[in-house]
């Protein structure tokens, strides 16, 4: 009976696909929830889990292709496929001469992020640098909220380095422990690259109760009691405007404050309009007298200049590469849809139309169809390799 059991055990092992493994540095393999001893070259099977440490690099042969796992990676083998859980994996038809050669190859492509950790309600940047042109086929930031993460090549002083940049917002109410940046690329030599990099997220917990807004008007009560109209307005902006990406960057590096006056409400404030209606404030409010000018915070193309149900008289400017600024509650619209405006041009006048208790400019910034604190764009944006090298490298 003992011999029959052993025979069945080995037969079940052989029913799984086998894969050759080579590695350098420290790696580990988990099989049936147990860590196995490693020789210099061993056989792997479906359901095995390979983890590479900071100095570990590995190669696996699967159906005639070479799968290369970079350091700090985690891969599950299943049905003749290497499923990436964390880190970076390269898929090639032609093998490297050695894993040392692959290690050097892997170091060419570098990824930087700012800030690290990411912060809920703030603007985020991810930069990919390489000596050769790369095709970024798909990229996502996985978490409770999922901003659009799309990359554009940017010019820089080092002609030997290609830089690809993505700008996005992180939802102000996000409370994740981390987000995961996932991306699929094709390199110049036709190597396929998949990566999954965890980035820590920090956030400010909301107060136990929202701050109640004083002076709620009958107009505001009517807006709150008509959720269908509010939904249609969101679908217009979020589904047809903010999701559009212009490949041209119209904006200067630094934005300007769009109005003068008293700063009446900060971005991210948790506010209650009625007993049952509370929201995070998605913009930055500047209060002033009715009819005071509102300026374009930067260069761009006007996508919306019309009266909306919730936002009142509203102007939305496309600054390119997925970045938009919006200005709500105007008493008068001046900029026209389709018009190119320059930073500092008057686009409208302060008012209290729509969901407003008094005259003010609600200034909103979005990137990747996600709002972020507008004050963050008043500082210099990163675009040159000299600036990027000072950021936190995440790969």
Predicted regions and their residues:
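Glycine- and acidic-residue-biased ligand/ion/polar-headgroup-sensing regions
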Residues: 18-34, 46, 51-57, 65, ...
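Polar, low-hydrophobicity, Gly/Ser/Thr/Asn/Asp-enriched low-complexity stretches outside signal peptides
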Residues: 20-25, 51, 80-108, 211-253
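Cationic-aromatic interfacial patches
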Residues: 99-208
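Zn2+-dependent peptidoglycan hydrolase active-site motif and core
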Residues: 281-282, 296-334, 359-364
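Conserved, short, structured surface segments that act as functional micro-motifs
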Residues: 313-316, 339-389
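Short, well-structured beta-strand-loop connectors
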Residues: 293-303, 335-350
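Surface-exposed, glycine-biased beta-strand/turn segments
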Residues: 198-311
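Sec-dependent N-terminal signal peptides
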Residues: 3-13
């Amino acid at each position: 009976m003992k011999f029959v059991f052993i025979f069945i055990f080995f037969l079940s092992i052989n029913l799984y696909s086998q894969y050759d493994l080579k590695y350098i540095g420290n790696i580990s393999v988990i099989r049936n929830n147990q860590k196995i001893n490693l020789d210099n070259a061993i056989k792997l099977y479906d359901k095995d889990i390979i983890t590479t440490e900071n100095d570990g690099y590995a190669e696996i042969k699967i159906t005639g292709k070479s799968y290369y796992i970079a350091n700090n990676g985690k891969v599950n083998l299943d049905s003749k496929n290497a499923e990436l859980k964390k880190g970076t994996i390269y898929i090639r038809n032609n093998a490297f001469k050695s894993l040392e050669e692959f290690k050097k190859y892997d170091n060419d492509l570098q990824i930087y992020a700012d800030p690290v950790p990411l912060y809920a309600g703030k603007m985020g940047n991810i930069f990919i640098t390489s000596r050769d042109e790369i095709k970024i086929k798909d990229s996502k930031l996985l978490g409770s909220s999922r901003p659009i993460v799309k990359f554009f090549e940017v010019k820089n002083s080092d002609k030997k380095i290609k830089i690809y940049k993505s700008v996005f917002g992180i939802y102000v109410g996000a409370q994740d422990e981390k987000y995961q940046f996932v991306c699929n690329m094709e390199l110049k030599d036709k190597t396929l690259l998949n990566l999954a990099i965890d980035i820590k997220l920090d956030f400010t917990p909301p107060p136990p109760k929202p701050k109640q807004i004083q002076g709620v008007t009958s107009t505001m009560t009517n807006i709150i009691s008509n959720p269908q109209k509010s939904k249609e307005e969101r679908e217009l902006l979020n589904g047809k405007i903010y999701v559009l990406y212009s490949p041209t960057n119209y904006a200067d590096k630094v934005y300007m404050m769009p109005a003068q006056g008293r700063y009446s409400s900060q971005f991210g404030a948790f506010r209650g309009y009625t007993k049952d209606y509370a929201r995070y404030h998605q913009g930055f409010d500047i209060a002033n007298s009715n009819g005071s000018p509102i300026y374009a915070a930067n260069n761009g193309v006007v996508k919306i200049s019309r009266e909306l149900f919730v936002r009142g008289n509203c102007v939305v400017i496309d600054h390119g590469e997925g970045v938009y600024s919006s200005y709500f509650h105007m008493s008068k619209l001046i900029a026209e849809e389709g018009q190119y405006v320059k930073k500092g041009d008057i686009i409208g006048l302060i008012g209290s139309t729509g969901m407003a208790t008094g005259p003010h400019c609600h200034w909103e910034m979005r990137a990747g169809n996600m709002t972020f604190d507008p004050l963050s764009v008043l500082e210099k944006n990163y675009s040159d390799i000299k600036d990027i090298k000072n950021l936190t490298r995440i790969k």
